Amino acid sequence: MVVVTVARSNADVNEKKDERYWNYECYTITTGSIEKYQIYQRMGRGKYSEVFEGRKDREKIVIKALKPVRKAKICREVLILRNLSHKNIIKLMDVVVDPESQIYSLIFEYIEHEDYAKIFEKLCYKDIVEYSRQILSALSYCHSMGIIHRDIKPQNMVINQARRELKIIDWGLAEFYHPKKEYSVRVASRYYKGPELLVDYPYYDYSLDIWSFGCVLAELVFKKRPFFHGESNSDQLVKIARILGYTHLKKYVRKYKMAPLNPKYEGVGERVLLSSFTPPGKTGLYTNAIDLLEKILIYDHQDRPTADECLRHPLFESR
């Protein structure tokens, strides 16, 4: 039988709170007036929503129109967003519902930002450290509130370079953490999925977000986007194993008594030092970043540092 693990920190946050804090199945969404908002132009489209730039009077806002999904999923996202308040987390301003279509829309603050793909190459070492600190600050906070984001990736971050400000967006896959609860492994985007998801381990915790953050940091440090580039979920694990090694993967699976690995993973090789991916001439500059990555990008979710532990790493000692 598979070994059930529990988060090393913040494991019982929700158990200590009133059930109304986390029970989205019983949550009733209070909505505002849809007439206050006007759609201006489309900004993007996702699997579960369409996003528009809008206006409230003369104020710019973001309108996230949700596609028809289970009501509980909408309630979960709204309840989580209403529970969170942090400078590095996008602010939910209102929720409205179309009286005819019954489609829900979430109203967010508007952040002036550049597309990540455009600024990816331009970010210098100090930028990388500062934005990493802000991501970890947001994760430390939401984890302390008993919430896992479950979809950390560059596309779910907006960066205002002029103000050196980052905010984490899209909390549609976020979930309340309860120890020993089985969760869906069909979360996170492929390139940022933790190994625990790829071996179908359902008892994951906040450390999933830390792995995903590590993938983002690796992209920025090594200028390799994405860092683990799988063509499918099974190939994603192959790409991870080619860097972290087959032996350590096998030990991880055996330790938690997971289903045996497919024999195809046997020939992927052994662990490669992450420092070997450092761009020429940057080795000394990125020593601390690589040291942190070596601690984060590991198979065993129980051994990854927490967001708080990451923030105490030497990488963030000087800003």
UniProtKB/Swiss-Prot annotation:
EC number(s) reported in the record: 2.7.11.1
GO cellular component, one term: cytosol
SMART domains linked: S_TKc
InterPro entries given in the database record: CK2_alpha (IPR045216), Kinase-like_dom_sf (IPR011009), Prot_kinase_dom (IPR000719), Ser/Thr_kinase_AS (IPR008271)
Catalytic EC class: transferase
Entry annotation: catalytic residues: D151 (proton acceptor)
GO biological process: regulation of cell cycle
Residues binding ATP, per UniProt: M43, G44, R45, G46, K47, Y48, S49, E50, V51, K64
Top-rank lineage group of the source organism: Eukaryota
One Pfam short name: Pkinase
UniProt keyword annotation of Nucleotide-binding present: yes
Annotated catalysed reactions: L-seryl-[protein] + ATP = O-phospho-L-seryl-[protein] + ADP + H(+); L-threonyl-[protein] + ATP = O-phospho-L-threonyl-[protein] + ADP + H(+)
Protein purpose: Catalytic subunit of a constitutively active serine/threonine-protein kinase complex that phosphorylates a large number of substrates containing acidic residues C-terminal to the phosphorylated serine or threonine.
Subunit note: Tetramer composed of two alpha chains, one beta chain and one beta' chain.
Family: Belongs to the protein kinase superfamily. Ser/Thr protein kinase family. CK2 subfamily.
Identification of the protein by name: Probable casein kinase II subunit alpha homolog
